[in-house]
Amino acid sequence: MLSKENKEYFRKLLSQRLEMLSAEADRPVSSVTHLKEESRDFVDQASMGSDTDFTFRLRERESRLILKVIEALERLDQGVFGICEECDREISVERLKARPIATLCIECKRAQEASEKVRGAQLPSYE
C-alpha cells in the first residue's frame, strides 16, 4: 500500500503532467503546421502534408496520454493506484516513479510484451 507521502507525490506529479499535456493540446495545430499558400512545389507540398500527418498523430498520442493520466488520478481517488490490474499485487514505487500511469507490475508487463511479441511473430508475412 502506498504511503500518504507517496500518494501526495503522485497526485502532484500526475496533476502537473495533466496541466502540461492540456496546455500542449490547447495549442493550435495551425501554429505547428503553418503553410505558405503560394508554395506550389510538389516536394514542398508532400513534405508539408507529411508534417501535418505527423502533427495529428502526435496530437492523438497526447490525447491518449491525457486520458491515461486522468485514469491514474481516478485510481488514486479510488484507492487502487499502484495495484496491478492483472495480478492485484503492488506495483513498485520505482516503476511508478518511472511511469506513473502504469497499470501493470513489471512482471505482468514483461509477460504482456512477451505475449505480444509471440503473436506478432505468428502474423502472416505479405512479402
Located regions from the model:
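Interaction interfaces in information-processing and related assembly proteins
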Residues: 1-78, 114-127
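Amphipathic alpha-helical recognition patches that constitute DNA-binding helices
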Residues: 9, 13, 86, 100
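Cys/His-enriched microdomains
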Residues: 82-85, 103
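Short, cysteine/histidine-rich loop/knuckle motifs that typically chelate Zn2+
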Residues: 86-87, 107
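Short, Lys/Arg-rich amphipathic alpha-helical interaction segments
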Residues: 93-127
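Short, flexible, mixed-charge glycine/proline-rich loop motifs
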Residues: 72-81, 94-99
